[in-house]
Amino acid sequence: MVLRSEILVNKNVLPTAEQALPGRETPMALPEFHYVFEGTPLLGPFFEGDIDFAIFALGCFWGAERRFWQREGVVSTVVGYAGGFTPNPTYEEVCSGLTGHTEVVLVVFDKNKVSYHDLLTMFWELHNPTQGMRQGNDVGTQYRSAIYCTSPQQLEEAKTSRDAFQAELSKAGFGEITTEIAQAPTVYFAEAYHQQYLAKNPDGYCGIGGTGVCLPPSLQGN
């Protein structure tokens, strides 16, 4: 078994539940409203449209969140941590590698304006899903690629889109997709200063970058 001390050094190893940090019962305090969508409650309620939720992990959540809030049909976004063991972790705890979480974006969208398939297309094309426990220069289990699905239909769509994108990646000489696709676990929201970070800090770091590979037009969203 890998020791906890080794995980602090080797950023490619996930902890077991027994090794994970204990966390806390109290969630992080969040602002009431979205910084970009002024007047929109960060976590709802959302009264207009046919609302659904999607959860994506594609590297540093600052840049990922910005790309999704820029998409027409998205009504809110929240960044957080998911897929691990530690309840209500801090950013520093997640960066230690001892929570098991990856950085995620919760995307709230109006299905009348943008489909889940559209968002999946964005997800695959915005990052490199073959890199395992890293994304570009960002190394660690918290940067691993994941799709956490809120319904069986989302799970089926995610797997179908993965297979289609894998075919295109293989043609371009890339390796196997390492993206985790699973039913949605609990999402623990990140600290307030992380929410819509690049809107508050336009010159802030953004390490997100795709492969240049696209889904064929027949399989893309709108």
UniProtKB/Swiss-Prot annotation:
Cited SUPFAM superfamilies: Peptide methionine sulfoxide reductase
Molecular function (Gene Ontology), one example: peptide-methionine (S)-S-oxide reductase activity
Family: Belongs to the MsrA Met sulfoxide reductase family.
HAMAP family: MsrA (MF_01401)
PANTHER family: MITOCHONDRIAL PEPTIDE METHIONINE SULFOXIDE REDUCTASE
Role this protein plays: Has an important function as a repair enzyme for proteins that have been inactivated by oxidation. Catalyzes the reversible oxidation-reduction of methionine sulfoxide in proteins to methionine.
Protein name in the entry: Peptide methionine sulfoxide reductase MsrA
Source species: Pseudomonas entomophila (strain L48)
